């Protein structure tokens, strides 16, 4: 279901954006976050289409963070293939990551829910803050376990949490 909407949302005339985003979106990622959104929506007996849109938003946000993370960490491999920044360079990777974030927010507006927009906007801020804290502590050999877990929570757990929480909003 999601892959159809992902494909239609990425159907644009710019080959560089399509190639770069598609390189990651069409890779062998597990897509656990959007799957959680869909499964929990079904468990809550949701019958609309907002769950699919939200799942795609989550996948776009997640992939944007991966594109940015590979640039920051100078990653060369992602999901067993050359990373996007290794193929197209850092500038393109950052900009396509920004493009995916923008697409996610554009899709959120389609749901016409300020609550959903607020939650996903806050989530994006938490993800960015976690990445910034990670970068700021790269050389910190005295990083406490508490601080490390806080960073990981912001970078990783937050999007999982929201993937599970959003269905409770659309079923109200």
Question: At which residue positions do the language-model features occur?
Answer:
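Single conserved hydrophobic/aromatic residue that forms the stacking wall/gate
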Residues: 1-7, 12
């Amino acid at each position: 279901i999601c892959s159809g909407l992902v494909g239609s949302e990425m159907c644009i005339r710019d080959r560089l954006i399509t190639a770069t985003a598609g390189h990651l979106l069409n890779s062998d990622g597990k897509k656990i976050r959007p799957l959680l959104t869909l499964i929990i929506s079904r468990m809550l007996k949701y019958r609309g289409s907002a769950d699919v849109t939200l799942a795609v938003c989550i996948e776009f946000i997640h992939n944007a963070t991966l594109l940015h993370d590979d640039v920051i960490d100078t990653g060369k491999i992602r999901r067993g293939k050359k990373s996007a920044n290794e193929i197209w360079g850092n500038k393109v990777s950052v900009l396509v990551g920004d493009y995916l974030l923008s697409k996610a927010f554009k899709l959120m507006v389609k749901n016409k829910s300020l609550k959903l927009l607020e939650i996903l906007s806050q989530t994006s801020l938490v993800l960015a803050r976690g990445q910034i804290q990670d970068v700021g502590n790269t050389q910190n050999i005295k990083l406490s376990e508490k601080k490390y877990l806080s960073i990981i929570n912001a970078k990783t757990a937050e999007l999982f949490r929201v993937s599970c929480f959003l269905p409770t909003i659309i079923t109200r």
